[in-house]
């Protein structure tokens, strides 16, 4: 997003060194995976395979592989977390703000995979076959957020916004769901949206 245009790879003199931040991020990912396992989430898809991409939303394998249509939403999370931490924690080095973003994303992944939220998704959205993410999918979602955060750090604001809008429109038209609709339907399900989401892909 290049709002902090002077930001470049940091050294210890500029704040939190990249290697330390990387160690913290890897530790947080390990904690996320461990807690998810303790919550009863399966390590990989129960189908026994790990796919790089799974594009069938209405399937028991959705949110079980490395990437899917919802990966784009997690990239947008990274855009938003970069913008938010830049606004609120502007004096912090970008490496420290990345750790904050990973903490937020990890907390959401744990919340999303709680029994309450899983049932909320199943009752209020099109995710009737959703029984929680596999651990590999959840960790991959956090990595997608990290990629979005890093992209936002380097891209101009206009490019970042354009990419986010493009993702939302194209994904929304293809699977009739996206980050915006997901949040709306999680907070307050609307029958009109649910009925619209039941239709076939528009593109």
UniProtKB/Swiss-Prot annotation:
User: Which superkingdom?
Assistant: Bacteria
- Per the record, the major location class is membrane
Family annotation (InterPro entries): DUF2585
Topology relative to the lipid bilayer, per the entry, is: Multi-pass membrane protein
Q: List, alphabetically, the GO terms of the cellular component aspect.
A: plasma membrane
Keywords carried by this UniProt record: Cell membrane, Membrane, Transmembrane, Transmembrane helix
Q: Which residues cross the membrane?
A: 20-40, 69-89, 155-175
Which cysteine residues pair off into disulfide bonds? none
Q: Where in the cell is it found?
A: Cell membrane
What does the sequence similarity comment in the record state about its family? Belongs to the UPF0314 family.
The record's section on NCBIfam families has: PRK00944.1 (NF002099)
Q: What is this protein called?
A: UPF0314 protein RPA0307
């Amino acid at each position: 997003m290049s709002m902090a245009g002077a930001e470049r790879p940091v050294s210890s003199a500029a704040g939190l060194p990249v290697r330390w931040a990387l160690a913290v991020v890897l530790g947080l990912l390990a904690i996320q995976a461990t807690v998810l396992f303790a919550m009863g989430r399966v390590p990989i898809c129960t189908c026994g395979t790990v796919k790089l991409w799974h594009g069938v939303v209405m399937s028991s394998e959705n949110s079980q592989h490395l990437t899917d249509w919802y990966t784009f939403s997690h990239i947008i999370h990274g855009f938003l977390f970069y913008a938010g931490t830049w606004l609120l924690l502007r004096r912090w080095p970008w490496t420290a703000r990345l750790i904050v973003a990973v903490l937020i994303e990890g907390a959401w992944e744990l919340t999303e995979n709680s029994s309450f939220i899983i049932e909320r998704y199943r009752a209020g959205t099109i995710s009737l076959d959703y029984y929680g993410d596999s651990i590999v999918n959840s960790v991959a979602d956090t990595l997608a957020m990290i990629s979005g955060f890093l992209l936002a750090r380097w891209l101009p604001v206009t490019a970042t916004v354009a990419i986010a809008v493009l993702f939302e429109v194209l994904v929304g038209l293809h699977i009739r769901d996206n980050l915006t609709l997901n949040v709306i339907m999680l907070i307050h399900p609307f029958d009109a949206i649910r009925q619209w989401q039941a239709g076939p892909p528009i593109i």
